[in-house]
């Protein structure tokens, strides 16, 4: 690893493979899946891959790193439905957040990281400031 971006240093806590249990507002059952976080060679980006065992929850890949211009970090997100989104992202004091402001479909997510597990809550607002839970996912580090 060479010259890892110091802004990404807190993401070291996520590196590894995680088993997931997700509950989506449109699906009655708990959906099993998995996720991996890994460094892209060079240490300037973190790559996230997720898989879910239900057709309504897409598989996805994301890349976390500095934006082309501006400050902070972004998550470039792509999924099996053909959806592509850009989120702002942060991981400070063990709390990971990502969000995007898109009129009619604002999104935000947060998780308080533990060493071996965490719950990630995804919310959306189709009307400004009227947030509703969209997805809750428990992540457990695979041994």
Protein language model annotation of sequence segments:
Residues 1-143:
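Hydrophobic small-molecule pocket/channel-lining residues, especially in calycin-type beta-barrels
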């Amino acid at each position: 690893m060479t010259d890892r971006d110091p802004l990404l240093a807190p993401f070291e806590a996520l590196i590894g493979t995680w088993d997931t249990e997700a509950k989506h507002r449109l699906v009655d059952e708990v959906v099993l899946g998995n996720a991996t976080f890994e460094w892209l060679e060079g240490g300037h980006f973190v790559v996230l891959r997720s898989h879910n065992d239900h057709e309504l929850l897409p598989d996805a890949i994301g890349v976390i790193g500095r934006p082309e211009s501006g400050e902070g970090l972004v998550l470039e997100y792509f999924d099996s439905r053909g959806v592509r989104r850009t989120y702002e992202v942060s991981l400070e004091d063990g709390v990971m957040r990502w969000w995007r402001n898109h009129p009619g479909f604002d999104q935000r997510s947060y998780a308080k990281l533990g060493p071996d597990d965490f719950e990630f809550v995804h919310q959306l607002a189709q009307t400004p400031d009227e947030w509703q839970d969209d997805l809750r996912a428990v992540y457990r580090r695979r041994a």
